[in-house]
């Protein structure tokens, strides 16, 4: 569980989740659209939407995370 | 990670590939002129050799080829990080 308490690992996990959710939504849209209004599972749909709409910023964040991972 | 340097390198490569693969075609790439349909229509079967068309082809290839494997790899890395840190 230590990824939840280390801020950088948490950030990395969230970034990877956003990326994979947007891939899943691009590939099989109904899988995530089904839970659009679900309280818990709706978060994945929201992350997919973030990954679609804000893709340049997500990509920039990925590159910055890679650089910081490389330097540490 | 077991192999110290290679584990970090793996993360770096994974993040960089993700950075290329998330760029959405119709919302972002087409607007800045790097979309695949925006490419000047090449003559039949002839490869263009400009840098821009190479970049367009690279982004398109990464997106079509690597998105589905990346789903699995991302989820594996997420589970690994959550369980073992």
Curated annotation (Swiss-Prot), chain A:
It is found in: Endoplasmic reticulum membrane; Golgi apparatus membrane. It holds the Pfam family DUF1242. It comes from the Eukaryota. The chain crosses the membrane at residues 54-72. GO terms for biological process: intracellular transport; protein secretion. Disruption phenotype: Inviable. Residues 27-53 are lumenal. The keyword Protein transport does not apply. Residues 1-26 form the signal peptide. One of its GO terms (cellular component) is endoplasmic reticulum membrane. InterPro entries: KISH_domain, Ksh1. It is a single-pass type I membrane protein. Keywords: Endoplasmic reticulum, Golgi apparatus, Membrane, Signal, Transmembrane, Transmembrane helix. 'Kish' means small in Hungarian. Involved in the early part of the secretory pathway. Belongs to the KISH family. PANTHER family: PROTEIN KISH-A. This is Protein Kish.
From Swiss-Prot, chain B:
The chain crosses the membrane at residues 2-22, 65-85. GO terms for cellular component: COPII-coated ER to Golgi transport vesicle; endoplasmic reticulum membrane; Golgi membrane. InterPro entries: Yos1. It is found in: Endoplasmic reticulum membrane; Golgi apparatus membrane. The keyword DNA-binding does not apply. The keyword Endoplasmic reticulum applies. Belongs to the YOS1 family. This is Protein transport protein YOS1. It comes from Saccharomyces cerevisiae (strain ATCC 204508 / S288c). The gene is YOS1.
């Amino acid at each position: 569980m230590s990824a939840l308490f280390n801020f950088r690992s948490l950030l990395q996990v969230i970034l990877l989740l956003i990326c994979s959710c947007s891939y899943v939504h691009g590939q099989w849209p109904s899988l995530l659209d089904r839970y659009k209004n679900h309280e818990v599972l709706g978060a994945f749909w929201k992350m997919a939407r973030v990954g679609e709409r804000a893709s340049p910023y997500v990509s920039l964040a990925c590159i910055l995370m890679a650089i910081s991972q490389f330097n540490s | 990670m077991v192999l110290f340097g290679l584990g970090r390198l793996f993360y770096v490569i994974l993040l960089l590939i993700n950075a290329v693969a998330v760029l959405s075609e119709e919302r972002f790439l087409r607007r800045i002129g790097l979309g695949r349909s925006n490419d000047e229509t090449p003559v039949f079967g002839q490869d263009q050799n400009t840098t821009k068309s190479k970049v367009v082809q690279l982004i398109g290839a990464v997106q079509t080829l690597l998105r589905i494997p990346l789903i699995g790899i991302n989820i594996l890395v997420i589970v690994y990080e959550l369980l073992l840190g």
